[in-house]
Amino acid sequence: MFDVDGVRYYADASGIRQTGWVKVSGTWYYLDPSSGVMRTGWVSVGGSWYYLDPSTGAMQTGWLQESGDWYYLKSSGAMVSNASVKVSDGTYWYMNGSGRHDKQAGIDIIMRTARSLLGVPYVWLGVYPQDGGMDCASFTWYLYKQLGIDIGFETYDQMYSGVRVFGDPQPGDIILMYYGAWPNYNPMLPEHVVLYAGGGMIYEEPTFGGRCQYVSLASKGASTTTAQRILS
């Protein structure tokens, strides 16, 4: 690296000024393809956004907080957008189209998808709407699949997704249901799962002969419920 009038460049061992990506002592830098000037801050390259340290120009990876917003940069340095990243507590952060952590944007996608599926028949072991129908667990799996999150096809997989909710559920939480009174039920085998929509309402694929519906949680008559939070 060398500076000219306060601007940084990089030349190879032959003294030839470089452009584009260069790796120096294990660190990546980006040099303007026209001028060779070392770039800093946000830069778009090949359809992806990267963040280069404002002081050193070093390409950043992992979590980045800027102006109060959180971003996630893959090991390649590329910013994650319109996708989810698993965080340390087992939940996921949804990164919106601008790359910012935006839980509400993720919830909105899930709710829009759920509304679009109203009336789809219940089909045991059905996976996708185009298969002719879905069951309760593939319904909630499909909703979270829209965010790039795999919570599993079965209720006994989904009971371990995200974190257990102690207290009132929030929109986007999944609620697992048991119908036998204690001790006549197996807490490891939930009998039903639904999406909590807020205000005491849920979206669900109900049971044989039913169709995807928007109903009250209370109407389900479950003896025991637990909730899991996937998005945070």
Show where each model-derived region lies.
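Aromatic- and glycine-rich peptidoglycan recognition patches
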Residues: 40, 105-113, 156, 163-166, ...
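Exposed loop/turn and edge beta-strand positions of beta-sandwich/beta-sheet ligand-binding modules
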Residues: 89, 130, 190
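Extracellular adhesion/carbohydrate-binding repeat motifs centered on closely spaced tryptophans
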Residues: 1-108
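Short histidine-centered beta-strand/loop micro-motifs
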Residues: 62, 185-188
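Glycine-rich nucleotide phosphate-binding loop and flanking beta-alpha elements
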Residues: 17, 101, 182-183, 209
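Catalytic cysteine-centered active-site loop
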Residues: 116-171, 176-178, 182, 222-225
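Short loop segments at secondary-structure junctions
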Residues: 34, 55, 76, 180-181, ...
